[in-house]
Amino acid sequence: MSTSATADAPADAPRTTTGLGDRPAGLARTGAGRSVGLLVAVAVLVLAVGLSLVVGSKPVPLGTVWDALTGYDGSGDHVIVRDLRLPRTIVGLLVGTALGVSGALIQAMTRNPLADPGILGVNAGAGFAVVLAVAFLGLTDISSFIWFAFAGAVAATVAVYAVGSQGRGGATPVRLTLAGVALAAVLGGISQGITLLDPQAFDRMRFWGAGSLAGRTTEMAGTIAPFVAAGLVIALLVARPLNAVALGDDLASSLGAHVGRTRVLVGVAVTLLCGAATAAAGPIGFVGLMVPHVARWTVGPDQRWILLYSAVLAPVLLLVSDVVGRVVVAPGELQVGIVTAFIGAPVLIALVRRSKASGL
């Protein structure tokens, strides 16, 4: 991968579009402004974590939350905080970060502002594997879904790359997109057919399929954390070459970027991140689509900053959506995937209505 200053030059181009219209750059145009904005985003994330621990069908005072974290005594409120809300908050942080970064990567690689992590068939592959495990192996525990879902996500991505690499030119963004959409349609249809024929599988899948953080444990967080960490490391490594790839394959190659290698690494990172997120929480839409746009609108087209902002803002959206889902129908709750869809759908409509919206 190229690390030359030339390959990084597009990051500072003053008239580069952001994908949200014909904007010259982000709101924060200087390094200092971007750093301050990132600190503000981190502060908002801390607030979202606090809300996730405090707010629910049974509100817990902030002081009690602190006592539960520092001096656990087994009381009812302490059990709620330590055994229920803290694990789902940690999983929400990991899943949100994974979805945000994978969304930014896939939009950069495909140069498509409407792309999301599921475009490579990751969600469909994970869902298909879980359906098979539930219908034919009788799995009932959510924690047992993780490895099947992750294996399905990896298998789907490999299949998409195998199909998209055929023919002259190799794995172009258009071919990968078409292969991913086709595979997702096929796997989704088969999954629906199996669940309709097996009522027990349908009953077990309906909550996981909607995307939820309820019932997640610290063990599940520990299971997906290494995959998320590996995906984030790869994302940071490809951030600089992606600035060149965003200009097009030919120009990126002339600037010294290794387009093919960058594309493969992006695919690996997206599979690790989105696969881990889907395995832990089920398919959650719109987070990986919407957050990279907000990041790009804020900081401009530099992928290094977009990835950092996406890693912070995406868990904010996910945790806030989870909190909203807990309180709107209390004492029950809405799955976080449903809430993010309600938030993300208007944003998607606004993006479609922008005739000047373009790639990176």
Model regions: which residues?
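Alpha-helical transmembrane segments in inner-membrane proteins
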Residues: 2-360
